[in-house]
Amino acid sequence: TKSSAASEVYKRQHHITLNGADKNTSIDFWQNILGMKFIFEQPNLDDLNTNHLYFDCGDGTTVTVFTNENLTPDKNKLKNECGGVHHVAFWVSQSTIRIAEKNLNDNGFANTGIKDRGFMDSLYFREPLGLLIELASYKFDPPIGFTHANVLEEAHKLRIKRNALNIQDEDIASAIKKLRQK
C-alpha cells in the first residue's frame, strides 16, 4: 500500500528550522531551558547575513534556528492560520517532561502544566518568539517488534468500537495484548 511504502522511504523527521532573532535568545531557550545541546553554528548558506544554529534533540535529529543579531524577540503569539504551523511536538521521556515543566516554571515561562491525553502526557508552552511547543510523552511501551504507531492504530479501532471520544488506557492495554498474540 502507499502508506506502508512511505514508511519505508521516510526514516523520521530530519530537522526543523525556525526563524529566530538574536543568537543568545535561541541558545538561552533551546539549550539552557529545554536542555538541547548547542552543537554548532555556521552561516545560512542561502543568506550569508543570517546565522544558522544547530541544537541536538538527542536522537540524531536537530532543531536549527536562523538568527540575525539585528532582530529582537517579538513575544506575540504567532497567528494560527490556514497553511501555518499550529505547534511543533517533541517526543520525550516521562522524566524529561517533568524536568522541562520545572525548568519552564523556574524561568518564568507560562505553560499548561502536564495534561493527560489518554495515551500520552503533553506539556504546551511558547518559545521566546511565540511558536507553540509541545513536549509529548507516551504512557506505554509497545511490544517487541511493534511501534507506538502500531499500538495507536489498533487502539483507535478499539476506541471506535467503544464509541469513545479518545483513546484511553483500556484501549492501549487491549491493543498491546492483541499485538502480542500476532
Language-model regions, residue ranges each:
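Single conserved hydrophobic/aromatic residue that forms the stacking wall/gate
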Residues: 1-6, 10
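Vicinal oxygen chelate
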Residues: 7, 13-21, 54-58, 75-182, ...
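Core segments of cupin and vicinal oxygen chelate
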Residues: 19-63
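A short, acidic/glycine-rich surface segment
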Residues: 49, 71-76
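Short glycine-/small-residue motifs
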Residues: 62-65, 134-135
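Membrane-helix exit/interface motif
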Residues: 67-70, 96
